[in-house]
Amino acid sequence: MAYTSIIIDDFYNNPDEVRDHVLTQDFNIIGNFPGARTEPMLNESTKEHIGMHLSEVHGDIHWEDNKEYNGSFQYTTKGDTSWIHADEWNHWAGVLYLTPGAPLNAGTGIFKHIETGLYKIPRLLDGTIDRELTDKIYDDAGDPTKWEVIDVIGNVYNRLVIYNGDLFHSSLNYFGNNLTDGRLFQTFFFDTYKK
């Protein structure tokens, strides 16, 4: 059985406290993503909590602590735009929604590339990425008419969605005007290894 996504509701025991703390942080990192991010804030208890949900089925988690976005908080507003992409450099990516009362349709979409029929990064027999085909697919990353939505995960407060890093995905339906009423979330990236 292959798992492509995992949803964990009520992730933090104290989401309101987490959110209140996050709202006092500096969102000063701008990059190849919509909105702005904090410095990474991945702590041991969060790692253990995610591991508790995944390790039995997927194996031990390996965290790339030096990844600049691992555990970062990010926010976007209605003026932001995104594109369809994959996070193929790791086995898993995660998004934890932290805006209470957010529109449900402002979650994460999983997409299939219409021309190729692929919904995840193409890999060669040795497991490496088929770079030529991936580049062709990524030429269509910003054109939603080239893609079909195959799954939508709703934006529910304190919900962590973990998905296979090879899946083509995008955030959906930005909202709000600022940090306090925009789409606030935390990002995670990691690998799993069976013993």
Residue ranges and their predicted role:
Residues M1-I84, G107-T108, I114:
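Non-heme Fe(II)/2-oxoglutarate
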